[in-house]
């Protein structure tokens, strides 16, 4: 047993300069855990509630002192003395203490900070790296990095409709080789854009954010960059998209404002079909809005044997919503974000449910990040085979990629790179 001795929260800043929560948790055997909570720019309505202060005179209303107070004055007294290694009991207590379906009283950012801090303290107490503590001896698969090399949507100014254009370097023997390829394509893309007279400023997640005429133009430049870097599009490196369609969906009209026009779901489905035929796309995240269950089921039936359709806003890492998607055949892949559901235990439940039902899982960062590397360890621990954590730029993104390099080295000959097996769509390129 590693009894919790103290819990303390403070307000810090994330990668966008917005306040977030840091929690420090100490146990009686000298272990210490640090919980750093990320934050999203485009968020699903069904996500657990992120508690913000709302005082416009302080950090423009984005302060989190209320969440900090909830940890220090409400959660801490209840969890002191509990066993940090009993993650389920700790998380269940905080959920019960909150008493709402979406953690809408204490705040998911307060609860997750404590949940993560306890996880790290427990791993340190057990003298195990985090991936080994979570996954036991089974965790050994290094994930394919889905690298967001062009930013649009809510992550950039002058944006295209599509929020993230990612490369997926799956045609390699090791993670380190795949990372190298991704980095080389990223740097090559900068030169490709410069030659076209396009800006190479960066978006929230480190990808380039030039002003594009069409969504397809972004894909064409990425294809050029892959080839110019010496790699084969499709065979070695595929393309993944995060459309984030809820961001440009109008509830009143039931239409998507896309490419400058109001489009219905049939138009969007046809657009995706043509895109998949034209480019080596292996993954599309949030192709339809977060309550468009029937449209999700339709596209999964039409194209789900060719690529993965990843539910982010649709599932929000919530086992209840994921179960609905499984039953309806809506989507075939889960995006995993710890702060969408708000506890480590519920996150692990969602991954397990996805795996048991033949869904892939992609562990993800948020646009407002910290130097925390939990998602790297989590991806290996649960052998998810996929991670998305931005471009190979900006310290908070690089930290995750570097942590995976460390894990690969630690695992040695037992390390396995997910590669082609991570994606259904890759089969047609083998």
From Swiss-Prot:
EC number: 4.2.1.11
Location of the protein in the cell: Cytoplasm; Secreted; Cell surface
Cofactor(s) it depends on: Mg(2+)
Cofactor binding annotation: Binds a second Mg(2+) ion via substrate during catalysis.
Superkingdom of origin: Bacteria
Binding sites annotated in the UniProt record for Mg(2+): 242, 285, 312
Top EC category: lyase
Chain ranges passing through the membrane: none
GO biological process, one term: glycolytic process
Catalysis: reaction(s): (2R)-2-phosphoglycerate = phosphoenolpyruvate + H2O
Catalytic residues (positions): 205, 337
GO MF term list: magnesium ion binding; phosphopyruvate hydratase activity
Pathway given in the UniProt record: Carbohydrate degradation; glycolysis; pyruvate from D-glyceraldehyde 3-phosphate: step 4/5
Function: Catalyzes the reversible conversion of 2-phosphoglycerate (2-PG) into phosphoenolpyruvate (PEP). It is essential for the degradation of carbohydrates via glycolysis.
Family, as annotated: Belongs to the enolase family.
Protein name, as recorded: Enolase
Organism: Bifidobacterium animalis subsp. lactis (strain AD011)
Gene name for this UniProt entry: eno
